[in-house]
C-alpha cells in the first residue's frame, strides 16, 4: 500500500468517526428542542425545565458546529499530498504509537487487514498538545521524548 493510500485510509476512518459524533450531536440537539416544545407554552420566564432543555440544545449545537468544522478540515486534508516532515495534517507512525496531527479527536480505529488484529489505533491530536509540539518538524528516524517515553519516528505520510 502506498503512502497516499495509507493516508487516505486513515483520514477516511477519522471522517467516519467525526460524522458519527456530528450525527449524535444533531440528534441530541433536536431531541432537546423537541422536549422543550412538547413541554407546552412558556408561562413563566424562569421556567427551569425549559431553560435546562435550551442549555442542552445550545451545548449540542456547539458540539455539532465543532464537529462540522473538523469535517471541513478533514475534507481538505484528503487533498493534501503525503508529508515528509511532521507538521499539521501529517500522519506520524512511531515505534510505539500512531498520530494524526490534525484535530483533537482522541483515539480512533482504522481497519487494517495487514494488522494481526485487523485494526490499528490512531490518535488525532491538535496543535495545542505536548505530543504535537514534541513531534513537530521531525523527520523519519528522528526521536523525541514525551512523558519520559522515548519514541522514534518510523513513517510520516
Regions found by a protein language model. Name each.
Residues 80-145, 151:
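Non-DNA-binding regulatory cores of transcription-related proteins
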Amino acid at each position: 500500500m502506498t503512502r497516499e493510500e495509507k493516508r487516505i485510509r486513515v483520514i477516511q476512518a477519522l471522517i467516519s468517526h467525526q460524522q458519527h459524533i456530528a450525527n449524535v450531536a444533531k440528534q441530541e440537539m433536536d431531541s432537546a428542542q423537541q422536549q422543550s416544545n412538547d413541554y407546552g407554552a412558556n408561562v413563566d420566564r424562569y421556567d427551569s425545565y425549559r431553560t435546562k432543555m435550551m442549555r442542552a440544545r445550545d451545548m449540542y449545537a456547539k458540539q455539532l458546529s465543532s464537529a462540522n468544522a473538523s469535517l471541513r478540515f478533514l475534507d481538505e486534508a484528503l487533498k493534501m499530498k503525503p508529508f515528509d516532515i511532521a507538521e499539521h495534517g501529517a500522519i506520524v507512525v512511531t515505534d510505539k504509537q500512531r498520530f494524526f496531527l490534525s484535530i483533537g479527536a482522541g483515539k480512533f480505529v482504522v481497519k487494517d487487514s495487514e494488522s494481526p488484529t485487523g485494526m490499528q489505533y490512531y490518535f488525532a491530536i491538535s496543535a495545542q498538545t505536548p505530543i504535537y509540539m514534541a513531534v513537530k518538524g521531525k523527520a523519519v528516524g528522528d526521536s523525541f521524548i514525551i512523558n519520559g517515553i522515548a519514541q522514534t519516528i518510523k513513517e510520516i505520510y
